[in-house]
């Protein structure tokens, strides 16, 4: 198959997945016109031409981390009459409800020439995924190199058009398909030794690779799945200003943890080997559970003080300030009883938890001697609450 035939086959496949093909969007003007329609519809607003131009000036930035944040949050914009418009770029509450469109051979001018992109997926008019294709026999790594070259070209589309919102790159020669997140230059390198990390091949739950473009599209590019990949399973590492995509087995583990809890189906056991990213899996499960109103607390329990610090630092690396330090058992008890959203995810050692809950513990006996309520009595109201407890290293 020629590259053109592979491209057409992918567009047809996306059509089967209920994407809308937009052959009319061929350049920057068409991209912006479509984005404006989608933006106004989503936010139930009509912008003047000058407001729309100002909006573009505000949201378009070469900083990938900034655009990734803008894409996931409620933002504000001052209108010509001085009133504030709170808006989102996509439906962040339910990504499945966004419009999913596909464009091909989009041409964007740079300082010295132009760049042409094989296939782009637009989510609510935002170019969120770029797919570069090669013919069979040509390594997809050539497509990776092309993306890196495009990003280094002065005045490229990723720095001064809506392409700054690309979250994900996919490269394929039809039989071999890889994907990786967009990032700022310091986290986005490709060298002669063909090292490019982190780059992924998608996999099924049994970890068998899904490499053929048709199968990949079916599994990964289904609208709701792609929405989840971007919104749930891409982590914005604030401390490093970096986008990090979870590996397939981590995604399945998180899904199973969340399902198990939501269906109230008892306990579970996640078996990940050393260095496989257990902390990220636990962090993601905790943050997704944080938004479940039926759950009072999510406790992540480790067995040593140094692990407590290490895990807390890792969690805070993924999301700044998401976990506070429990300096002592009293702090832990206070946070367990707190209704504050910030205290919903707690990292603690099994020793501190034991001191609080064990009626016969030294701490509880000392409090009793001093005529104060035992921690175990203070925590009694939690008996009827739904608590999620994740034990690390529970072998």
Which residues does each PLM region occupy?
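ATP-dependent helicase/translocase motor core
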Residues: 1-297, 306-322, 341-345, 351, ...
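Conserved ATPase-coupling elements of RecA-like P-loop NTPase cores
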Residues: 356-361, 394-395
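Conserved helicase motor
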Residues: 305, 326-335, 350-355
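Walker B catalytic acidic pair
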Residues: 349, 392-394
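Short amphipathic alpha-helix with an adjacent loop that forms part of the alpha/beta core around
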Residues: 336-339, 380-381
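Short beta-strand/turn micro-motifs composed of small residues
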Residues: 172-173, 302, 391
């Amino acid at each position: 198959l020629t590259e053109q035939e592979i491209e057409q086959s992918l567009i047809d496949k996306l059509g089967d997945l209920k994407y809308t093909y937009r052959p009319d969007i061929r350049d920057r003007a068409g991209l912006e016109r479509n984005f404006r329609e989608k933006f106004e519809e989503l936010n139930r607003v009509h912008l003047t031409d000058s407001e729309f131009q100002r909006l573009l000036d505000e949201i378009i930035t070469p900083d990938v981390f900034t655009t990734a944040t803008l894409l996931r949050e409620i933002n504000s914009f001052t209108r010509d009459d001085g009133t504030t418009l709170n808006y989102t770029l996509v439906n962040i509450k339910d990504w499945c409800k966004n419009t999913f469109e596909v464009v091909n051979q989009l041409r964007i001018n740079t300082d010295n020439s132009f760049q042409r992109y094989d296939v782009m997926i637009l989510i609510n008019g935002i170019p969120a995924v770029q797919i570069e294709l090669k013919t069979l026999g040509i390594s997809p790594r050539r497509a990776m190199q092309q993306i890196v070259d495009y990003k280094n070209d002065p005045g490229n589309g990723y720095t001064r058009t809506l392409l700054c919102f690309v979250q994900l790159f996919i490269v394929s020669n039809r039989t071999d398909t890889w994907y990786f997140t967009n990032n700022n230059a310091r986290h986005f390198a490709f060298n002669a030794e063909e090292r490019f990390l982190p780059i992924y091949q998608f996999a099924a739950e049994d970890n068998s690779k899904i490499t053929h473009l048709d199968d990949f599209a079916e599994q990964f590019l289904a609208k709701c799945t792609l929405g989840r990949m971007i919104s749930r399973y891409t982590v914005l590492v604030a401390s490093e200003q970096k986008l990090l995509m979870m590996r397939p087995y981590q995604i399945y583990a998180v899904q199973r943890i969340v399902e198990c809890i939501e269906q109230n189906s008892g306990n579970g056991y996640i078996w990940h080997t050393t260095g496989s990213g257990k902390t990220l899996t636990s962090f993601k499960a905790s943050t997704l559970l944080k938004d479940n109103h039926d759950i009072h607390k999510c406790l992540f329990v480790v067995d040593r003080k140094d692990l407590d610090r290490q895990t807390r630092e890792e969690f805070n690396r993924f999301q700044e300030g998401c976990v506070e330090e429990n300096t002592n058992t009293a702090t832990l008890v206070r946070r367990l009883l707190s209704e504050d959203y910030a205290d919903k995810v707690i990292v603690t050692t099994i020793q501190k938890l034991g001191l609080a809950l064990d009626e016969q513990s030294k701490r509880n006996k000392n409090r009793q001697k001093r005529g104060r309520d035992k921690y175990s009595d203070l925590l009694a109201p939690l008996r009827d609450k739904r608590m999620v407890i994740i034990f690390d290293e529970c072998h």
